[in-house]
Amino acid sequence: MQQDYCPDIAKLAEGGFNKVFILRAKNGREVIARIPTPIAGPAHYTTASEVATMDFLRAVLKLPVPEVFAYSTTSENPVGAEYILMERVEGESLSSRWLSLTTDEVKDIMIQIAEMERKIFDFRFPAYGSLYHTKDLDWKHQIPIVEDFVIGPVSSREFWHGERSKTEIDRGPCRVSPLSTFPFILGFLEKEPTGTGLIIAVGLSPLDCVTSAARREMAVIQRHAKPQPRQTFLLPTNYNIHPSEHTSLLSQFLQVAPHLIRPGSYSAPTLRHPDLSLSNILLAPGTSKIISIIDWQGATILPRFMQAGYPAFCHHDSSQPQSLEIPSLPDDFDKMGIDEQRQIKAIFRLEEANLYYTAATGVHNEEHMNVLKIPHLGMQQYLLRQTGYPWDADVINLRAALVGITTPSVWSKISSAACPVEFSEEEREAAIAESQEWNESEQLLSRVREHLNIDLEGGTEPDNFERAVEGNRQLRIEMVRQAEAGQQEICWRNWPYKDQEDNSMPPQR
């Protein structure tokens, strides 16, 4: 900013992972200051990777992202915290314009997004991991790309949270061997009895990346996990579940994983925005032109079939074929009340965005569309996500995901090989039933959050705090009142939105 000081500093926003401030210089110029919270991710790596990702996208791929003016990857500075100073983009968030856009504007925005994603998909990264500047990473842990950009360890918080930061686990970077794109060569090499240099190349396949989360959690569970009751909302247990139940399922996944790997470009190292939501896309005021995409914290380079998918603002059901029918509003839309109109318009816009994003991707980003056509891609990605969740005695969804993938009608579309994991019909029925109960529980919990106006972690805006606290108290009491005899205490204890130190007993009926 070339100013001695900023006479005006104002907080713009605060979330679970960042505090955002506006700094105004004496000449009136404004910049954004982002300070990560302690839970945002690993110290140094989180900030260093976000900066390098934005710089790479802006300088190399010429994409509209904020310019970084200065940053610090250490808290040993006058601020006392890591920070990023970046350009303040004078734009309107797509979320603020979403329901007022015309269909033609939605089409235009989806085309722009698809074209930007194509530029990212077209870049050939040599490895999986996160982006960094050379100066911000130890030379032993970097793989050069272009200019001073390198690939280093994954900066995702999941790989560093809690005990993981002190555990020897695979965080990358993982260089991609050209051999991994030619499975017939790998098949030959794997039969060789001796460990030559070529044999080592087999270990550099996408499989290392796909299984890293499962191997990470197994390492942590084996060292630190203890038996505990399941505390899932509406599905708690009054008995302990042993961690071996979790590691057993992860072991079964590791048997399945090699069959999920796709050769060639399907596994190409690909960068993707970690949260391409409406609020992270900025438009030029009064237009449909995208002028900036923000919040690249936690962006990683992973196999393409792990990265492919639809943005959150698309209403896409991966279990159903993509419909080409143009969505429309009901004939009696104009006769509805304002609230009902907003609900109907929101659904209509999601369906519209899904259709035009699909069309734009098919025309402008063929590489992405090819991956989206992989049979049961959504089920495979869901299973991969489940393998990365920490031990909490709730393995319902991991088990259900494994059961789903190994169902003969599904497996036959994924692999021509025999499935290495088998479940009895009784086990399958039990897993599906538990999963249905879990989904019903989550739907109810979602309604609770909506009623209280709180986020997933129970956070809310300051103006809503007192109302949320009182509403939460009443709902908790009502939950206990409706519980079956003998279940009141466990329902009270397992209420999801209570203080950690709350060891109180339920009120007497």
Swiss-Prot record:
GO terms classed as biological process: cell adhesion
Keywords of this entry: Cell adhesion, Virulence
Gene induction: Expression is regulated by the hypoxia responsive morphology factor A (hrmA).
Pfam families in the record: APH
InterPro entries: Aminoglycoside_PTrfase (IPR002575), Kinase-like_dom_sf (IPR011009), Mito_inheritance_9 (IPR051035)
Domain of life: Eukaryota
CDD domains named among the record's database cross-references: APH_ChoK_like
Biological function: Part of the subtelomeric hrmA-associated cluster (HAC) containing genes that alter the hyphal surface (such as reduced total chitin or increased beta-glucan exposure) and perturb inter-hyphal interactions within the developing biofilms, resulting in a loss of vertically aligned polarized growing filaments. Consequently, this hypoxia-typic morphotype (called H-MORPH) with altered biofilm architecture leads to increased hypoxia fitness, increased host inflammation, rapid disease progression, and mortality in a murine model of invasive aspergillosis.
Protein name: Subtelomeric hrmA-associated cluster protein AFUA_5G14880
Origin species: Aspergillus fumigatus (strain ATCC MYA-4609 / CBS 101355 / FGSC A1100 / Af293)
